[in-house]
């Protein structure tokens, strides 16, 4: 008897990809058009009210995020008219399919990854990371609320808007082992990493490179959570929990190792 064996699937596989450069350039331009003006508007307001914002940097960050979220939602509203087939996942997940637990667990793992990647020299030397965070009660509350809200802002823009748009304009899928996401998610993960380019100007080179790498990987995970749950809620939770817990850990170390 002859036994037929199916050919092994390659470990990395691209399927149905129709790559076109102009949608990727459009996504990069749209990313900056959403992020930069909103941030500069918040900066202008902060300059006008310098007496308050100089002592409450978290409020400036939060204000910029509010403006960026509103800009992202406005672009999604336009996209729904221009590209009605584009998925935005701006919905509550179906009951039992929200991946809330995995989102929380992934957020904790991401916080640990960022803490080590960003601050490993200080951690090894038992020297407090100088994150510059205000550790007064109001400062702690402000920073944690703002960081926990980062997922609402960035997932709306990067996964809801940009992945949704490119899913239609650059269709296809990419699979690595059992990890399977739309090709648009891979493209936007690259853009998500590039959005952190300012770290090359203000941080040591090793830290900037680490931030690029983990931002790219996190971007892939956020897309996976979004597609599996059919909602932005799980990636928003993972993103916000990761950012908030890393900042909380840095604040604890600032106090424990006597940096004010």
Summary of predicted features, one role per range:
Residues 1-17:
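Short, Lys/Arg-rich, polar N-terminal cytosolic tail immediately upstream
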Residues 21-82, 102, 129-133, 137, ...:
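Alpha-helical transmembrane segments in multi-pass membrane proteins
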Residues 28, 103, 107, 143, ...:
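Residue-level signature of transmembrane alpha-helical cores of multipass secondary-active transporters
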Residues 35, 39, 75-80, 114, ...:
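Structural signal for membrane-spanning alpha-helices in multi-pass inner-membrane proteins
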Residues 38-49, 117-124, 197-203:
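Juxtamembrane "helix-exit" motif on the non-cytosolic side of transmembrane helices
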Residues 71-84, 156-167:
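Membrane-water interface of transmembrane alpha-helices
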Residues 118-119, 139-260:
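Transmembrane helix-loop-helix hairpins at the membrane interface
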């Amino acid at each position: 008897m002859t036994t037929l064996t199916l050919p092994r699937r390659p470990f990395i596989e691209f399927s149905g990809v129709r790559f076109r450069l102009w949608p990727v350039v459009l996504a990069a331009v749209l990313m900056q058009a959403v992020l930069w003006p909103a941030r500069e508007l918040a900066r202008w307001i902060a300059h006008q009210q310098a007496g308050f914002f100089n002592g409450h940097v978290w409020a400036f960050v939060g204000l910029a995020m509010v403006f960026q979220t509103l800009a992202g939602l406005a672009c999604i509203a336009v996209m729904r008219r221009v590209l009605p087939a584009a998925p935005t996942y701006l919905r509550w997940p179906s009951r039992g399919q929200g991946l809330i637990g995995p989102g929380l667990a992934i957020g904790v793992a991401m916080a640990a990854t960022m803490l080590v990647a960003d601050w490993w020299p200080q951690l090894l030397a038992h020297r407090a990371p100088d994150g510059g965070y205000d550790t007064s009660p109001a400062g702690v509350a402000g920073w944690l609320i703002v960081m926990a809200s980062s997922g609402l802002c960035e997932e709306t823009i990067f996964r809801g808007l940009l992945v949704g748009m490119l899913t239609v304009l650059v269709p296809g899928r990419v699979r690595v082992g059992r990890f399977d996401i739309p090709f648009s998610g891979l493209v936007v993960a690259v853009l998500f990493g590039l959005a952190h380019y300012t770290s090359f100007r203000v941080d040591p080179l090793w830290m900037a490179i680490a931030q690029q790498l983990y931002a790219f990987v996190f971007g892939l995970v956020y897309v996976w959570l979004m597609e599996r749950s059919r909602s932005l809620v799980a990636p928003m939770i993972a993103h916000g929990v990761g950012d908030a817990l890393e900042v909380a850990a840095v604040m604890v170390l600032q106090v424990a190792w006597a940096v004010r």
